[in-house]
A protein has these predicted regions:
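Helix-breaking motifs and short loop linkers at transmembrane-helix boundaries and internal kinks
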Residues: 48, 80, 101-107, 118, ...
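Extracytoplasmic
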Residues: 17-51, 72, 238-244
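Helix-loop-helix hairpin linking two adjacent transmembrane segments in secondary transporters
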Residues: 107, 136, 145-192
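Paired small-residue
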Residues: 91, 95, 106-114, 308-316
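C-terminal transmembrane helical hairpin of 12-TM major facilitator-type secondary transporters
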Residues: 285-328
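Juxtamembrane intracellular "pre-TM" segments in multi-pass secondary transporters
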Residues: 2-12, 193-225
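Cytoplasmic helix-loop-helix junction between adjacent transmembrane helices
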Residues: 111-152
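Conserved MFS/SLC helix-loop-helix module at the cytosolic interface between two early adjacent transmembrane helices
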Residues: 67-106
Length: 403
């Protein structure tokens, strides 16, 4: 009886509480993380920076988030999921408020790095909490809803920062977003049910390193780690530099319009849970291949020099991305038999490391070939993803036949 699981079922009050609280956590986390993305051009002008240098305001956060996940995951295995997530939200809101008061580029990067480190506690632990507490039959649906909350948060942070930066200043935009995140942190602390299936695990540094290496040797999980790296790297690269494309000749759109363009993210509210459901019909590998092909098609469409066509291309690209992310997140939760918190942390470490490295390096290709250079690089990243998905599909199909 000691190992009996007390899962939260779909339709119950606790399920609703989990959905709302993790939606708020995702909203706060990703509005803070991505609020600088649509104002990279503004930061370039204010501090006389190149596109690649300006992108460090985002890459510093995602890099520190990636590193932090290697520690916050194991920390949550020891002290509990809710404690880590709650503390992370409050700290991230505080660092973002401090960032809004900085006047030098170096100090801004430092504060953004601290913000990313704080946010790692939510990003690393939320999927683990769901995998432990939600009934397995509902997990893919619930994971999709969580990612939908992330999507809306990312969209809202981007559009809010764009509008406030145009009407007032980039400092005011960060200040308002930090206050909103603080309110959501309070609601999260109050609403989220305490873990029922959590069992504390003592992880020492040597064991953490050993487990890290072991997971990279796993035939399925290791490929999911690489998939996350190229997926997120591709997504961030496109949205880091599309603003530069549209703010310059021949479009000259407003900063506010760049924020509104983020509305394409809302397709993730549909495609994330939908992909979770379609896994049962087509399998993880096939769903990943379909999602990646949709991303490539969207990117090709975005080459046309008409804003409505570019919008359509980004819409398809985003739909494919959020579907693929939902599939990989669900698969990680299912494959991690022990130390789920740390396995999820390694996946997200790879995911955000891809964002940091590829998102900044791709600035060189913007300088060389503008949008064509960016698109070429991203298609190469996605082609690697398709190769990984084909291998995953083969391994998973063979494993299912042996059952």
């Amino acid at each position: 009886m000691q190992n009996k699981k007390y899962y939260i079922e779909k339709g119950t009050k606790k399920f609703i509480a989990v959905t709302i609280s993790l939606f708020l956590a995702g909203f706060a986390t990703f509005s803070i993380l991505y609020c600088v993305q649509p104002i990279l051009f503004v930061l370039s002008q204010n501090f006389s920076l190149s596109p690649a240098q300006s992108s460090l305001s985002l890459s510093s956060s995602t890099a520190m988030m990636a590193i932090g996940m290697l520690f916050t995951g194991p920390l949550s295995d020891k002290i509990g999921r809710k404690k880590v997530m709650s503390s992370s939200l409050f700290l991230a809101a505080f660092f973002t408020f401090c960032c809004s008061k900085m006047n030098s580029w170096e100090h801004i990067i430092f504060m953004r790095a601290l913000t990313g480190l704080a946010l790692s506690g939510v990003a690393a632990v939320a999927m683990t909490y769901l995998s432990e507490e939600i009934h397995p039959n509902t997990l893919s649906f619930s994971m999709g809803l969580y990612i939908s909350g992330n999507t809306i948060g990312g969209f809202s942070g981007r559009i809010l920062s764009s509008i406030l930066a145009e009407k007032f200043s980039w400092k005011i935009s960060l200040e308002w977003i930090s206050i909103l995140a603080f309110v959501f942190a309070i609601l999260f602390l109050y609403l989220l049910p305490s873990s029922k299936n959590f069992h504390s695990i003592a992880l020492h540094p040597k064991k953490i390193f050993t487990y890290f290496i072991a997971q990279w040797k796993h035939p399925i999980v290791s490929k999911l780690f690489l998939m996350g790296f190229f997926l997120m790297g591709s997504f961030i690269t496109v949205f880091n530099y599309v603003g530069y494309r549209l703010l310059l000749e021949p479009f000259f759109v407003s900063q506010e319009t760049i924020g509104i363009l983020s509305i394409v993210y809302l397709i993730g509210v549909y495609s994330s849970p939908k992909a979770g459901i379609l896994i049962e019909k087509y399998g993880e590998g096939r769903m990943l291949i379909i999602s990646l092909v949709i991303m490539i098609v969207g990117l090709i469409i975005s080459q046309w020099n008409r804003i409505i066509i570019i919008f359509l291309g980004l819409f398809l690209f985003s739909a494919g991305f959020f579907a693929a992310h939902s599939v990989t997140s669900t698969c990680i939760g299912q494959q991690a038999r022990n130390n789920r918190g740390y396995t999820s942390s390694i996946y997200l470490f790879s995911y955000y490391l891809g964002s940091s490295i590829l998102g900044t390096i791709s600035g060189i290709f913007w300088t060389i070939g503008k949008w064509t250079g960016i698109s070429t690089m991203v298609i190469i990243f996605l082609y690697i993803g398709i190769v990984l998905a084909i291998k995953l599909n083969y391994i998973i199909d063979n494993a299912n036949e042996l059952k």
